[in-house]
Amino acid sequence: MPKSKRARVYHLTQVNKKGREAKERLFSNIRETIPKYQHCFVFSVDNMRNNYLKDVRHELNDCRIFFGKTKLMARALGTTPEEEQADGLHRLTRYLTGTVGLLFTNRDPADIESYFSNLSQVDFARAGTVAPRTVTVPPGIVYSTGGEVPPEHDVPVSHTLEPELRRLGMPVRMIKGKVCLGDEKGEASEGYTICKEGEVLDSRQTRLLKLFSICLSEFKVSLLGYWSSASGEVTELEAGKTRPKREGNRRQAMNGDEMDEDQSSDEDSD
């Protein structure tokens, strides 16, 4: 007997959102961590990728990294001299804007700076990313890298990709079993521009870039500044000099209701 189309299973459960308990846990974890480490860095992340960040956590397993709402992290550190949890720490909160995190460490600051200066991973761009350069597929036979390498070091794309390339807007056609832009010699086409420098990529463009194995995103961590417990001083690093700073705290205190409305936390890492 055929299965009834009306016999559907409706799941009534929901995934619990991070609520007040998670916020309070992140808040208390940051405060408990402050006296255990000599230095606290504020870092920003370009083109966040969780798999690359996991590698950072693994390689810096003697440090502790926190991510969360910037207002919550700032409040945990203390935004005024009266509220700060250690001498001079409130001056670090001016860097807590945008996609940033806190890194607590006992390593020498020079070692941390050296590690992150050499950290860079390229990846496929996602929708919403700004194109760092113009990418144009040359006319003629379409190759697997879209013209990123010379034809003699490349191979033509498979004929099975022709329908998808057409669906994504490329005016390709089959000529003698090969996917081509214009004719086989490239004389009847000017090539196809996938994206232009400075424009925001959409999902169609990112799919085309991925089909041609073109990586336009770079996962990179920039150190903005750090606080040292021994001196109570905050040292501004090069990336922090050009980044917009957090405005001064307009309120000397925030009650629990305000924290619950304005701030939600992400998980921290040991």
Swiss-Prot record:
Keywords: Cytoplasm, Nucleus, Ribonucleoprotein, Ribosomal protein. Belongs to the universal ribosomal protein uL10 family. This is Large ribosomal subunit protein uL10. It is found in: Nucleus, Nucleolus; Cytoplasm. It comes from Chaetomium thermophilum (strain DSM 1495 / CBS 144.50 / IMI 039719) (Thermochaetoides thermophila). Transmembrane segments: none annotated. Residues 234-270 are annotated as: Disordered. Component of the ribosome assembly machinery. Nuclear paralog of the ribosomal protein P0, it binds pre-60S subunits at an early stage of assembly in the nucleolus, and is replaced by P0 in cytoplasmic pre-60S subunits and mature 80S ribosomes. One of its GO terms (cellular component) is nucleolus. PANTHER family: MRNA TURNOVER PROTEIN 4 HOMOLOG, MRNA TURNOVER PROTEIN 4 MRTO4. The keyword Ribosomal protein applies. Associates with the pre-60S ribosomal particle. GO terms for molecular function: RNA binding. Pfam families: Ribosomal_L10, RL10P_insert. Gene3D superfamilies: 3.30.70.1730, 3.90.105.20. InterPro entries: Mrt4, Ribosomal_uL10, Ribosomal_uL10-like_insert, Ribosomal_uL10-like_insert_sf, Ribosomal_uL10-like_sf, Ribosome_Assembly_uL10. Residues 238-250 have a biased composition (Basic and acidic residues). Residues 257-270 have a biased composition (Acidic residues). GO terms for biological process: nuclear-transcribed mRNA catabolic process; ribosomal large subunit assembly; rRNA processing.
